[in-house]
A protein has these predicted regions:
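N-terminal secretory signal peptides
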Residues: 1-17
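N-terminal Sec signal peptide cleavage junction
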Residues: 36-37
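Extracytoplasmic "Venus flytrap"
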Residues: 68-96, 117-124, 146-147, 213-220, ...
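Beta-alpha junction/loop-to-helix N-cap segments that form part of ligand/metal-binding clefts
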Residues: 89-93, 106-178, 187, 275, ...
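Periplasmic-binding protein-like
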Residues: 133-146, 166-168, 210-213, 261-271, ...
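Extracellular/periplasmic Venus flytrap/periplasmic-binding protein
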Residues: 173-174, 181-284, 320-324
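Extracellular/periplasmic periplasmic-binding protein-like sensory domains
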Residues: 281-350, 360, 431, 442-446
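Segments of small-molecule ligand-sensing domains
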Residues: 336-345, 356-420
């Protein structure tokens, strides 16, 4: 809506401890969260070196306890992009986490605090912050990451040190593939799920495709998934182009797409860079070609004018304003006055909701206890309604949250609404999570 700034701060954000009523008992064991999925230009994570300490769920710090005892206080920690080009994603997830805390405290006899730290979009910085939150702030589990490279870095360390971690908005298929971990549970859909969501529509739209993608783990796994699906359906990928991320100039890559002659272009570009690529697609006069993006984030297009946003033909989505369900949640986000509701708000909510509920079911924040209560768990919290009512469960074989996904397209400009919050896209079809998730045996995950 007007007055909501779609552009993030560029200054590093300090670590902060927030809550509607912050509990001063800082010794309580807690939860930690990172948010998101765009990239940092780095490669995949390497785990950061294990300490062998098994930090999660101490049980002696006045928070969660072992042995099935009740839990009356938790401290949630969140490492995410709070400055720089991805702050708009990280800060939305923080808002979602705060709303989840409000609901969980109202429903349960539990006090929850939230501690946030800025990843600065750097895997090493993020790992340092996550380690500090666990070892110094004594949080119970970690969640988050906008960047898939950041998420893989933290996931490796969490797996080696028995810390539960929810990579809140990271979509690289590696997180529930070769980079999966005993204590890592992905609440967002994977790239392969989103690629499958739009695969048939892409195949029906054109016989030949040119794919350009952000050159790091998120874009690499997206390109592999989309190309594989197109080729399985007998379509031709005339060429693929890895694009450095982030990049200020997409002109040369758009020129290559134009020169390819392909009637359709897959624009698998991360974060706000997609705005730059879209503007240059228009500048080069190829916006009439079929344009597809497997992972739509509404806020990226809200930074463009409506005419520019209307060029998107095919997109996949985890959730957004166009999705059925969650109307009350969407309005609560809008009432905050910070930004309109979109997928990162939901992912922040889901991560806290599922982490806290797992601790409460287990009576402990011990990583093994949380894993036991999450594996195979069928979700029955308010997030099911927010996602439109479809089945949601934590798959035991790879720790992927199986959930509905959507295909969406841009509305005609005359039908794009701005009140009570922006709705510029429309949902075309809903897919059951089991219909788009690859079989566990094909993921490369071994738990």
């Amino acid at each position: 809506m007007d007055g909501r700034d779609p552009n993030p701060s560029t200054a590093p954000a300090p670590r902060s401890a927030t809550r509607r009523r912050f509990i001063a008992a800082a010794g309580a064991a807690g939860l930690v969260g990172l948010a998101g999925c765009g990239g940092d230009g780095g490669g995949g994570g390497d785990g950061g070196g294990g300490d062998g300490g098994g930090y999660g769920g101490d049980g002696d710090d006045g928070g969660s306890t072992d042995g099935g005892a009740s839990v009356d206080s938790l401290s949630v920690g969140m490492v995410t992009s709070m400055s720089g080009p991805f702050a708009v994603f990280g800060n939305a997830a923080v808002t979602g986490a705060e709303l989840a805390i409000e609901d969980l405290e109202a429903e349960n006899d539990v006090s929850i605090s939230l501690t946030t730290a800025d990843s600065q979009l750097d895997p090493s910085t993020a790992l340092d912050e996550a380690r500090s939150l666990v070892t110094e702030d004594r949080v119970d589990f970690l969640m988050g990451a906008v960047s898939s490279a950041v998420a893989l870095k933290i996931a490796g360390w969490a797996s080696e040190n028995a810390v539960t971690y929810f990579p809140t908005g990271a979509h690289s298929s590696a997180l529930t593939g070769g980079g999966c971990g005993q204590y890592v549970f992905r609440p967002s859909a994977s790239n392969s799920m989103l690629a499958t969501t739009i695969g048939s529509e892409m195949a029906a739209a054109a016989d030949e495709w040119y794919l350009m993608y952000s050159d790091y783990t998120w874009g690499q796994t997206a390109q592999a998934a989309v190309a594989g699906l197109l080729e399985e359906q007998g379509k031709t990928v005339v060429d693929t182009q890895a694009v450095p991320f982030p990049s200020d100039d997409y002109a040369q890559y758009i020129n290559q797409a134009k020169a390819s002659g392909a009637p359709a272009i897959g624009v698998l570009i991360a974060g706000l860079d997609l705005r730059k690529a879209t503007n240059q697609i228009i500048a080069k006069g190829i916006q009439d070609r079929t344009l597809a993006m497997h992972q739509l984030e509404d806020i990226v297009y809200w930074g463009l004018d409506k005419e520019s946003a209307s060029i998107l033909d095919i997109a996949g989505q985890v959730w957004g304003p166009a999705a059925d369900g969650g109307d009350e949640f969407k309005q609560r986000v809008a009432d905050r006055g910070e930004m309109d509701p979109y997928v990162r708000h939901l992912l922040g909510y889901v991560s806290v909701d599922q982490g806290v509920r797992a601790v409460l079911r287990a009576g402990s924040a011990d990583a093994d206890a949380m894993r036991d209560t999450l594996e195979g768990h069928e979700v029955d919290s308010p997030i099911v309604e927010m996602k439109g009512g479809g089945e949601m469960y934590w798959r035991a074989g790879d720790h992927q949250l199986i959930q509905p996904t959507y295909t969406v397209s841009s509305r005609p400009t005359a039908e794009m609404s701005d009140d009570p919050y922006r709705e510029w896209f429309q949902a075309e079809e809903t897919f059951a999570g089991d219909d788009v998730a690859r079989p566990v045996e094909e993921t490369g995950c071994s738990l």
